Amino acid sequence: MSDLESLKTSLLADIAAASDEVGIEAVRLAAMGKKGSVSELLKTLGSMTPEERQTRGAAINALKNEITEQLTAKKTELKDAAINARLKAETLDVSLPVRSSPAERGRIHPISQIVDEITAIFADMGFSIAEGPDIETDYYNFTALNFPEGHPAREMHDTFFLQPDANGERKVLRTHTSPVQVRTMEAQKPPIRIVIPGKTYRQDSDATHSPMFHQVEGLVIDKTANVGHLRWILEEFCKTFFEVDSVTMRFRPSFFPFTEPSFEVDIQCDRSSGPIVKFGEGKDWMEILGCGMVHPNVLRAGGLDPDEYQGFAWGMGLDRIAMLKYGMPDLRDFFNADVRWMSHYGFRPLDVPTLFGGLSV
């Protein structure tokens, strides 16, 4: 039995000397691996006589069990030691304030928020969202919308023209979102109820104008659409968007090439508090949008018979109504990517606006 005792002493010494998990694994393989010293002894059990199994066999199994227990205990000891060493090296001040999550630190840009608010309001009224290209043809941007030749909007001082293509046609950066109206009429049969948010481009830049700005407009086409429907939709929108119980609006006659009759819409407000305008109260008036009944020529350009269908449309500047609602003094701040400005005027990303909540909180 002296050989078993010697092996046991040697293996226990190796186990005790192991300083990490790699070392203890090497000892395990040397003892219990396929060709390990204990495994080789276990292979001899089959050739032993019954008497030998009772004595030497029992001693070999006892050696195996003890070595296995010692290996397991050493592994646990080394694992605990590694954890303790890491904890000792990693200092953590539990009195420090908890970091906010990325969702709390980030902010939604006011324009993105305004688009979400407006589309949520009109979606709850049964409207769908339509979009179109920023680079438009002269036809969709002007001709199909009843802009006559020589109209000021066709001049270089107001419109960004691209270089002529191989066919000599010059495309433009769209000056309004109205081309989507004609594209929708061509692609979809009435009834049509769409709201169209998007970027537009004009050569203008000051505290209240930008060469690139945002618009949203709506379009309704069916056989019975009228100004009464238009007024109701705009009143409901303004009450919800400006979060007031009632609004007083007035429709002033105006002119737009693509609508007839055309109106500019004013809303009653209180402008005595500086940049923040209070809607639904006061004695002041402020223009917020333009609208009208879709011109018969625009219906024809969209492939519709004006004797059978009629409709109305409205449009407004997203940047301007954002400035009005939230008291922002300078349009140029919208595009400066100032983190401090975003932290002040931005919105929490998990606050999704709907008709029933989350519009500005």
From Swiss-Prot:
Q: In which family does this protein belong, per the annotation?
A: Belongs to the class-II aminoacyl-tRNA synthetase family. Phe-tRNA synthetase alpha subunit type 1 subfamily.
Reactions catalysed, semicolon-separated, are: tRNA(Phe) + L-phenylalanine + ATP = L-phenylalanyl-tRNA(Phe) + AMP + diphosphate + H(+)
A Gene Ontology molecular function term of the record: phenylalanine-tRNA ligase activity
Full protein name: Phenylalanine--tRNA ligase alpha subunit
Quaternary structure note: Tetramer of two alpha and two beta subunits.
Q: Which organism is it from?
A: Allorhizobium ampelinum (strain ATCC BAA-846 / DSM 112012 / S4) (Agrobacterium vitis (strain S4))
- Which gene underlies this protein? pheS
Keyword field contains Zinc: no
Cofactor(s), by name = Mg(2+)
